[in-house]
Amino acid sequence: MDTTLDPGLGLRIRRTESLTSLIRRELERMIEVGELKAGDRLNENALAAKLGVSRGPVREACRGLEQSGLVHVIVNRGVFVREISNREAAELYDIRAALYALAGRLLASKITKKQVTELRRMVREMEEAADKGELNVFYPLNVRFHEAIVQFSGNGRLLSMCTSVHREMHLFRRRTLDMPGRMKISNAEHASIVDALEAKHGDRAARLMEDHVLKSRELLFGPLGTPAD
């Protein structure tokens, strides 16, 4: 696995952000877009060489990723992107469905025209990516769309909980979007969600958000199926 980081990464270091934090964010991005996949080994020496830094901040970044559940350390072997079991994945889907339903209900009561415009812009961009079959473009937009809904809901604790679940779900969520035609179907569901939010229909928005997540679960495991590892 090529663990090359963004060549301009070192140039974007801010005084208020440590190198360790920057490396961690970049590694999270690589996992999010599938550049680093479940089971891949993170070569600390290679990453340090790419950045022109010592192994220290790279090692610290990996420790942070371990705490967030994205990687795990195998003694005398190294750091690996964590592989999620089917049962863990199903449990995360169930949690995410409940959290998103709440986000939809909360946001519907307070959504602004500016927020609706922003969500519709993302839907249009995802539609363009789906038309071109560009999963690597669609997926980050998809992530931002869902994050925006939770953020717009205005509930800080909900945002924190969703962020934690999202991080782990990056390890397998792309699998459903890889399925033929799934990007178009998923984005049609996005458009319906925005329609419900704009109309301030809280119950409908909550139901659509929950269904949207559970449909992805069903694609992986079958209707109400018990996943087998």
Task: Describe the role of every protein-language-model region.
Residues 1-109, 114-115, 151, 217-229:
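Short linear motifs at protein or domain termini
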Residues 17, 21, 187, 203:
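Electropositive phosphate-/nucleotide-binding environments in soluble metabolic enzymes
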Residues 18, 116-117, 181-184:
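Short helix-capping and inter-helix turn/linker motifs at the boundaries of alpha-helical repeat units
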Residues 66-67, 71-72, 165-167, 181-184:
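Mobile beta-alpha loop/short-helix "lid" or hinge segments that flank ligand
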Residues 92, 98, 113-174, 188-196, ...:
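Conserved amphipathic alpha-helical segments that form helical-bundle/coiled-coil interaction surfaces
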Residues 169-173, 177-180, 217-224:
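Short amphipathic alpha-helical interaction/hinge segments
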